[in-house]
Amino acid sequence: MTAKKSLTIFDHVLVPEHRVLSKEETEELLKKYNIKPSQLPQIKTSDPAVQALDAKPGDIIEIKRKSPTAGVYYYYRIVVED
């Protein structure tokens, strides 16, 4: 009997790494850039990555993107209801 491998959206080569920031990390991020959560780009709860992370509205997602020209950079989005 062969075991089935469970795949997630993050296994796809084109999907960058996502993670939910802790409360402390969120506070540091907002302080560092002197911004409010409402000033961040939004990501909806229906997004497959948000669902895979089990993120809730108000959570901030850090997206780690890799680029051949820019190297590694981070992008932040706040989770909002559909």
From Swiss-Prot:
GO MF, one example: DNA binding
EC number per UniProt: 2.7.7.6
Pfam families named among the record's database cross-references: RNA_pol_Rpb5_C
Reaction equation(s) it catalyzes: RNA(n) + a ribonucleoside 5'-triphosphate = RNA(n+1) + diphosphate
One GO cellular component term noted in the UniProt record for this chain: cytoplasm
Disulphide bridges, residue numbers: none
Subcellular location(s) per record: Cytoplasm
Record's function text: DNA-dependent RNA polymerase (RNAP) catalyzes the transcription of DNA into RNA using the four ribonucleoside triphosphates as substrates.
Quaternary structure and interacting proteins, as annotated: Part of the RNA polymerase complex.
Family: Belongs to the archaeal Rpo5/eukaryotic RPB5 RNA polymerase subunit family.
NCBIfam families for the chain: PRK09570.1
Annotated protein name in UniProt: DNA-directed RNA polymerase subunit Rpo5
Organism: Thermococcus sibiricus (strain DSM 12597 / MM 739)
Lineage: Archaea, Methanobacteriati, Methanobacteriota, Thermococci, Thermococcales
Gene (UniProt): rpo5
